[in-house]
């Protein structure tokens, strides 16, 4: 399953920042604050002009491609797990964007066998508007796709300085790092997610932020946010948002 593979990747050799000194913790917090400044970016086409973290895999003439993803996952007690979200590949060389809307259903039978069903609907973006590239007969689904909003378009972290007592971790070998905070139900982003995705649980949510690259770097590399409301063997409600900067694929560099 895709999400299990992601979890495996995330579980790497992590070094607690407490053993690295206050300076490293400060660098990580400053880097996350830098990343959070892109929220909100209402016009996604602004990413065509944003620089990202570049490693040795980038060709010198490649401006890179932004990969933006937002996905909501819900699993009520006794029900199957359903994820709905969208992925965009924003090529800075061609200033063009393609992607897909994805619906994933995950169920588990009495023998503990897992069935993963996934449907993708290709899309493109023109003038900041999402357009399906194949005919969709289901009008409700078509409206979901055309009116989809990424978290980066409405999320805001202007009060991120209020996040206190976070768990900070750093792996210098990857390099990657993370920070986890417990949020209140009065948090702006939590209110936005509850309204947009009809989240009824009143359990206190937490925010996990992950990043890759040098924390001292001036550009955004890989960044992942996860807002978890409930996550256990019986019930799951969580939202993930990621911004990733990759080398462009194909010949249109």
UniProtKB/Swiss-Prot annotation:
A lipid is attached at residue 20 (N-palmitoyl cysteine). Gene3D superfamilies: 2.50.20.40. It is found in: Cell membrane. A lipid is attached at residue 20 (S-diacylglycerol cysteine). One of its GO terms (cellular component) is plasma membrane. Residues 1-19 form the signal peptide. It holds the Pfam family DUF576. Keywords: Cell membrane, Lipoprotein, Membrane, Palmitate, Signal. InterPro entries: Csa, Csa_sf. It is a lipid-anchor. NCBIfam families: SA_tandem_lipo. Belongs to the staphylococcal tandem lipoprotein family. This is Uncharacterized lipoprotein SERP2447.
